[in-house]
Structure formats: structure tokens, C-alpha cells
Amino acid sequence: MRKYCEKWNYAPLFEDCSTRQEKKHTPWVDDKDPEIGHYVPMRTMIKFPLLEHFMREEDCGQNNDYVAWIDNDCVVTNYSVPITKWFDGHDKDLVLAFDVNGVHPTIILMRNTVLMRGLVWACKEAGWRMYGMHGWSDIMAFRFMLDYPPYADRVKFFSAQEMCAMPPMVHPMPADVRSQFEWTPDSWTVHLSALDLQYRVSIAQQFVEKLGLI
């Protein structure tokens, strides 16, 4: 990822969110429980406050035209594709991938507009309150918000095979279904999701060595 960012002069932030928790009201836990009352896991939802931070010059000290979230289990395999490429040929403000399960926000690309700042704020606040304890909290927040104005017509979807493909012949699903979303040499990244950590590292190393990514 660092090498890709260096090529395009991007400013990356790497954040380990795997054990983060944030104080947020939720009706789904017992407020009287001193261990969990009022606390919901950050994990996937951390992407919304982080995106919001880098969309506001008064917070981050920069005026960013675009912001991007890329899960740390994604390996960029095609350095020739800049982030701005995904905004070519359309006027949408948000770019997401889709896979067999629908919305797949392992990569989130946004123009820095008032509408998108509103979206990440809404996902961070209302989305968190509704879905903070859900295993796919970020996905559910997007599904809810993107179904309605003012956001419904501001998103452009690309296949996960193009943006964040699955490693070939790894995930246990019907082969004909899986093949629609598996990595090809034209894929931008490979997404090593829902796998044992050591297995992810092993697959990542294979891609790095085969494609000379470092």
C-alpha cells in the first residue's frame, strides 16, 4: 500500500481498529452493565469518523478533494490505477463495490462534497445507533442510507472483481458464483477477507512475490 501511495503522491493513514471501542448510546446493551453499558465495538464503523475527519480541513489541516477507505486486508495489485480513475465518466460522489451479498464497502471512495460529509456523519451517528452491534455494521448503515434521498442516486457501483476481488478458488461458495468476483490481472486489489490471519499473510506474500509489488 505504501508503494502504491508513493506512486500517486497520496497521504496514507494506517490505523489498527480491530479492538477499538467508542462510547456511543445503543439500545441493544444493558446500560447498567459496567462492562459493556453504552459501549459498542468500533471495528468496521471506525471508517466513518475517520473519513469525516479527513473531509474537514478544520480537523485534518488539509483540503482533500477525495478521500478513500481501503481495508488493511486489501492488497493493491495494479499500481497503474489511480483512485480518481473510479470517478471517470460519471458525476457520482460515492464509489463502492458490490459482490454476491450486495454492498461491499471494503473500499470506499468519495468526493469531498457537503452531501458526502452528511452521509458519513449520518452513518456514524444514526447508522451506529441502529447497527452498532451488528456484525456487518458498516454494510447495514450503507444499505439503509443509500436506499433513500438524498444519497440514493449519488453512488456508482463497480463489481468487486474490478475493485476488491476475492483470491481465486479460496472461499467456500459455488464456483460459478465465486468466479464472478475472483481476482484477475485487471483487478485493482485483492481482498483477503474472512480468512485466518496467517493464511491471509501467506496469500498476500504470494501476490507480492508473483507481481513484484515491493
Residue ranges of predicted features:
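The feature represents the membrane-entry module of six-transmembrane cation channels
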Residues: 2-6, 35, 39, 109, ...
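Catalytic core and acceptor-binding pocket of nucleotide-sugar-dependent glycosyltransferases
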Residues: 49, 115-214
